[in-house]
From Swiss-Prot:
Coiled coil: none
Residue numbers binding ATP: G11, P12, S13, G14, V15, G16, K17, S18, T19
Location in the cell: Cytoplasm
Provenance organism: Syntrophotalea carbinolica (strain DSM 2380 / NBRC 103641 / GraBd1)
Protein name per UniProt: Cytidylate kinase
Gene3D superfamilies from the UniProt entry: P-loop containing nucleotide triphosphate hydrolases
GO MF annotation list: ATP binding; CMP kinase activity; dCMP kinase activity
Database matches in InterPro entries: Cytidylate_kin, Cytidylate_kinase_dom, P-loop_NTPase
A single GO BP: nucleobase-containing small molecule interconversion
First-level EC class: transferase
Record EC number: 2.7.4.25
Any Pfam family the entry gives: Cytidylate_kin
Record's GO cellular component terms: cytosol
Entry's family note: Belongs to the cytidylate kinase family. Type 1 subfamily.
Length: 235
């Protein structure tokens, strides 16, 4: 039986982290933890409560009373915030931008950090976000950093929102992706950056299946290294 690994997937918005994390977890029969969705939940709750993104004290209290769970229902992964299915509500452009500002607050990150580590410390998990391999689990056995051009990521996001019936503009969507990049990379606490030992995959000219195949290859190689019994079987 293969050792249960901690797999970290980092990268900017619109690069395919959520889809790939979900499919990789399904293939490996691991638990999928979307850390970005956790910050989106904080942003949604703050928006509903009328809290400012820089009101750190109120945000800290908000996080302390918040329950976030990931469940599978009818074959689909759902995000529950205090028991409510907010899977769609947290994916709007407004909440996406707000989540970047909210996640820049140290107390919010500290609260979410503890929860993320608690969820993943036993292994057998795929975590995706922006600082998994650098901050949340710097000792993760497998680390990926996914990249793509801002224009390609903006186009993907535009098509995703259009498919949901939203009235969006391509140029504006690309601009929002670039703004999110600047916010994520420029924040003081846990900025977006590639871990030194992460495997970089540029997805600009790759489809999901191609990226997934590459990730599965890396995981299989790492399982061979991490499982001492494999060495004995090979000798």
């Amino acid at each position: 039986m293969n050792r249960q690994l901690i797999i970290a997937i980092d990268g900017p918005s619109g690069v395919g982290k959520s889809t790939l994390s979900r499919r990789l977890a399904q293939q490996l029969r691991y638990v999928n933890i979307d850390t970005g969705a956790m910050y989106r939940c904080v942003a949604l709750a703050a928006h509903r409560a009328g809290l400012a993104a820089d009101d750190e004290k109120s945000l800290q209290a908000l996080c302390a009373d918040m329950e976030i769970r990931f469940v599978r229902k009818d074959g689909t992964e759902k995000v529950l915030l205090n028991g409510e299915d907010v899977s769609e509500a947290i994916r709007t452009p407004e909440i996406s931008l707000l989540s970047s500002r909210v996640s820049a607050q140290p107390t919010v990150r500290q609260c979410m950090l503890g929860l993320q580590r608690q969820m993943g410390e036993q292994g057998g998990v795929v975590l995706e976000g922006r600082d998994i391999g650098t901050v949340v689990f710097p000792s993760a056995e497998v680390k990926f950093f996914l990249a793509a051009t801002a224009r390609e990521r903006g186009k993907r996001r535009y098509l995703e929102l259009k498919a949901k019936g939203m009235d969006v503009d391509l140029d504006q969507t690309i601009a929002e992706v670039e703004a999110r990049d600047a916010a994520d990379s420029g924040r003081l606490h846990a900025p977006l950056r590639q871990a030194e030992d992460a495997v970089l995959i540029d997805t600009t000219c790759m489809n999901i299946d191609q990226v997934l195949e590459r990730m599965l290859q890396v995981v299989a190689e790492r399982q061979q290294v991490c499982d001492p019994s494999k060495e004995g079987a090979a000798s």
